[in-house]
Structures are given as structure tokens and as C-alpha cells.
């Protein structure tokens, strides 16, 4: 009898073991295995282990190599910024559209919506699936001169711009600044050594990438979120069944509070006197400028690249108007 029970128990364990087959993940973190993104992914791996998903994390400090290895089949999934994962899912890749989510409350509402089962169909595109979305903080403009505090003041300034970020290049051209082609591994060095006048990054870069050096002695950080940046976990859509994929997204959403606490500590680490405050009257104008640019980059008109998903832009517009119904955009004829 004991032998029968033991055999039966082992037979029941086999499917569970098979379901926990490892899923290798190329993880981009500019700091490497000791960085905040990699640590968040380690916590996420613990969360999904109970689902029978055993993540094997491989750290990469070069995002292009991480995505390249994923494309080459060296990893089953990749965790990278949405600027790089946009080709795998244009819908979620549009979260970082310029000026589309002016507050963290707006971002929270969006991510809560995307974690629901009814959004599952939007998480798949052409053989790939989004398994998790993790905020890395709002993107701010770091400047070497505090007088660079308006869109007009950017004219002629040298801006470190990611070569593959077509929307940023369009915006830099729009404000008549000068694009200095860069990537995530070298933009900080260019800003810190004075090769460029401005750089665009989340608050973590102030200390982690030593951008505090680049703003000395007369610069600062413009206190306006140009975009909400995220790291997205993308896998081939045959790696997890629909139920596990949905639970994986819910696990990522369940970590939102933890991740936002980390972002809050990173923003708090920037001394108050280093922030450059923008008058509310100016912000209204900037929001309309960004909206016009989003429409151009949705439709691919006026020389703009077509990089934004209309469905995501509409969803984010609905979220903005729910939180600020009096905004002019909410009754505009060309509302997103």
C-alpha cells in the first residue's frame, strides 16, 4: 500500500515539475546584476515561481545586446525599456508617449487597467506577449544651465538623444534643438563631460549614472514628467499558456507599490534646490504641444514617424480627462 501511495504521489508531482520548466530571461539593467531593475526582476521571479514559472535571469548592461540575444533565441524572454520593446508590442510600447501620462496617479490607473483579464488580447502581437510592465520613473530633462527652462530655450542646444527613439528625435527637431545620437550606455558620459547640454532620464540616473556631475555648477532637473518610462517583460507567446501569462501580469501589477516606493526614494535623493520648477501656466502650453506631437506620431504626418498606437493614446486620454475633466483637450475636436 505504501509503495502504491508513493508511486501515485510521484506521478502527481510530474506534471507540476514539467510546468515549472525554466524560462530564461535576458534582463537589461545599465548597472548590471546589482541594479534596481535586476533586483525587481529577482523579486518578480519569486512571485511567479508559485505559478510554476521558473525564471532564469541573465543580466545585460547593453540593452541592444539583450534584445539581440532574445531575437536570436538565446533567451525565452527579455526585460528591457519600452523604447526597445515597442517593436514587439506597439500598444504597450506607447505608454512612454511624450506627455501622455502627466502624473503617477494616471500611470497607476493605466497599469491597473492593463493587468485585468479583459486587456489580455492587447498583450499579444505577432508571436510575442507582454508578461509584465514595471515603472522605472518619469523621464526628466537634466540641463547644464538653469536658464534652459522653457521649450524655446532648447533651440540650438545639444541634446543626447537615443538613436532608436524616433519620437524623441522628432520632439528634439520640433523644438529646434540639436540631436546628438547616443545610447543608454553613453548618454550619461556625454552629459557629464559637457558634450551635450541636456539629457533625458528617470531620477535614478542622478546617482546611479552620476548625472549630478553634469548639472554642476549651474544646471538642474526640470520638474516636469516628459514621459512615463517602463521596463516590459516580453516573451514568445508560446512559452506560457494564457492562464499563466495572465497571472504573470497580475503578479507584476501586484509589485506596483514596491516599485513606486523605489522610484519615490530615487526622486527624493535629488536635492530640492536642484529641481527647476515650471509655472502652471507654462505646463498647459506644453501639454498641448505634446498632444499635437502625439497626434502627428500616431498618424505619421508632417514629417513625423508613425510610432504610437491609437488605441493606447485614446486610453491614456480617457484617463487624463477622468482626472482633469476641465482640460481643453477633453472637448477638442481632434481629441485622441
Regions found by a protein language model. Name each.
Residues 1-4:
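Positively charged n-region of N-terminal signal peptides that target proteins for export
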Residues 7-15:
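Bacterial N-terminal signal peptides
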Residues 16-20:
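Boundary at the C-terminal end of the N-terminal hydrophobic targeting segment
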Residues 21-51, 129-193:
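Bilobed "Venus flytrap"/periplasmic-binding protein-like clamshell domains
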Residues 21-86, 320:
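General N-terminal leader/first-domain-start detector
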Residues 58-97, 142-144, 199, 203-215:
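Pocket-flanking alpha-helical
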Residues 81-175, 211, 225-335:
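Contiguous mixed-secondary-structure segments that line small-molecule binding/active-site clefts
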Residues 178, 182-214, 222-229:
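Glycine- and acidic-residue-rich phosphate-binding/metal-coordinating active-site segment common to enzymes
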Amino acid at each position: 500500500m505504501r509503495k502504491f501511495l508513493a508511486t501515485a504521489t510521484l506521478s502527481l508531482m510530474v506534471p507540476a515539475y514539467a510546468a515549472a520548466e525554466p524560462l530564461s530571461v535576458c534582463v537589461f539593467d545599465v548597472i548590471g546584476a546589482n541594479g534596481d531593475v535586476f533586483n525587481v526582476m529577482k523579486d518578480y521571479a519569486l512571485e511567479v515561481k508559485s505559478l510554476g514559472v521558473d525564471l532564469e535571469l541573465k543580466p545585460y548592461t547593453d540593452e541592444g545586446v539583450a534584445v539581440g540575444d532574445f531575437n536570436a533565441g538565446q533567451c525565452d524572454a527579455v526585460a528591457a525599456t519600452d523604447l526597445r520593446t515597442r517593436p514587439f508590442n506597439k500598444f504597450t510600447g506607447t505608454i512612454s508617449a511624450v506627455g501622455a501620462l502627466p502624473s503617477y496617479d494616471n500611470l497607476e490607473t493605466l497599469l491597473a487597467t492593463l493587468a485585468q483579464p479583459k486587456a489580455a488580447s492587447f498583450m499579444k502581437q505577432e508571436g510575442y506577449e507582454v508578461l509584465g510592465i514595471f515603472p522605472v520613473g518619469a523621464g526628466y530633462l537634466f540641463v547644464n544651465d538653469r536658464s534652459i527652462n522653457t521649450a524655446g530655450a532648447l533651440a540650438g542646444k545639444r541634446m543626447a538623444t537615443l538613436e532608436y527613439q524616433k519620437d524623441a528625435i522628432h520632439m528634439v527637431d520640433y523644438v529646434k534643438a540639436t540631436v546628438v545620437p547616443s545610447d543608454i550606455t553613453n548618454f550619461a558620459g556625454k552629459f557629464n563631460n559637457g558634450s551635450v547640454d541636456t539629457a533625458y532620464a528617470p531620477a535614478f540616473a542622478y546617482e546611479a549614472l552620476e548625472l549630478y556631475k553634469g548639472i554642476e555648477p549651474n544646471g538642474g532637473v526640470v520638474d516636469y514628467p516628459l514621459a512615463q518610462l517602463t521596463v516590459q517583460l516580453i516573451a514568445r507567446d508560446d512559452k506560457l499558456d494564457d492562464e499563466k501569462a495572465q497571472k504573470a501580469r497580475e503578479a507584476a501589477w501586484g509589485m506596483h507599490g514596491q516599485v513606486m516606493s523605489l522610484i519615490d526614494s530615487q526622486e527624493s535623493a535629488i536635492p530640492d534646490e536642484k529641481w527647476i520648477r515650471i509655472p502652471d501656466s507654462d505646463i498647459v502650453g506644453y501639454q498641448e504641444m505634446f498632444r499635437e506631437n502625439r497626434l502627428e506620431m500616431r498618424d505619421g504626418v508632417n514629417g513625423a514617424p508613425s510610432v504610437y498606437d491609437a488605441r493606447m493614446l485614446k486610453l491614456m486620454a480617457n484617463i487624463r480627462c477622468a482626472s482633469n475633466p476641465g482640460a481643453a483637450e477633453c472637448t477638442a475636436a481632434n481629441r485622441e
